[in-house]
Design a protein with these regions (language model features):
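Polytopic transmembrane helical bundles with strong interfacial aromatic enrichment
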Residues: 1-249
Length: 249
């Protein structure tokens, strides 16, 4: 068997995943805090004020990475859910459900920071703009997945039902991504592009990319931590799980 496939196969074992998550979750959190400190320092003290928005634009160094992550985490959740439904892989069920509260947090941060930025720029805390409205619907989808997963007593059936909802909700992602281009919108178009020329000066973009990296690291740490907790809960009757949780046998 291919070494990479063999590693993934072994990782599907609950005890192996527990050891992996216990080792690497703190690393993800540590790297996330370090890169976030660097990114925030650059955003607050190094980058000059915007010539149109003044210092108000600095909140975008939190808003933009959070918005990107709200979409990324949902897409990843749907992928895990699809794998779990097709191949009945328990670890993917756990990972999919662990994504939901993290993605909901990123979406809530996106909406909150967008409102804070919108008040001085648009003169209102909220507008039923296509981008804002679709992002709010995304938050409701996350909450729906969380609620459905919690409402069904059987853990595997709960994960499958919530995973199906997550897969159905994927159709919203392109709506959020292209809403500014498809409809008249107050929301500004993309100023930072992975491919193509960005409208923001390069001297102002490096803290943003550092913050994007910070959210990735933090997400990885949080995903591993939440998945490990769910894994231990499901395997609570096993000796290895008792030992890992520090409980007496």
């Amino acid at each position: 068997m291919n070494p990479v496939l063999l590693w993934f196969h072994q990782l599907g074992s609950p005890p192996t995943f527990d050891r992996f998550a216990a080792r690497w979750a703190p690393v993800g959190f540590g790297l996330g805090l370090l890169t976030m400190a660097i990114g925030l320092y650059g955003a607050l003290f190094v980058v000059p004020a915007d010539y149109q928005q003044g210092d108000s634009f600095r909140i975008l160094y939190i808003h933009v990475p959070a918005a990107w992550m709200s979409l990324f985490v949902y897409a990843l959740m749907a992928v895990y859910a699809a794998i779990a439904l097709i191949w009945r892989i328990k670890l993917c069920e756990i990972l999919a459900m662990a994504c939901a509260p993290i993605g909901a947090l990123f979406t809530a941060v996106t909406l909150a920071t967008g409102s804070i930025w919108g008040k001085p720029m648009w003169g209102t805390w909220w507008d039923w703009d296509p981008r804002l409205t679709s992002e709010l619907v995304l938050l409701f989808l996350y909450l729906g997945v969380i609620g459905l997963n919690a409402a069904i007593e059987d853990r595997r059936n709960a994960a499958r039902a919530a995973g199906f909802l997550a897969i159905v909700g994927v159709v919203l992602l392109p709506v959020i991504r292209y809403s500014v281009e498809w409809w008249n919108s107050l929301h500004q178009g993309a100023t930072i592009k992975l491919f193509g020329e960005s409208t923001m000066d390069s001297s102002m973009t490096w803290p943003l990319w550092v913050m994007v990296l910070a959210t990735k690291f933090w997400f990885a740490g949080s995903l591993l931590q939440r998945s490990r907790a769910d894994n231990l809960e499901r395997e609570a009757g096993k000796d290895w799980a008792r030992a890992a949780a520090g409980a007496p046998r």
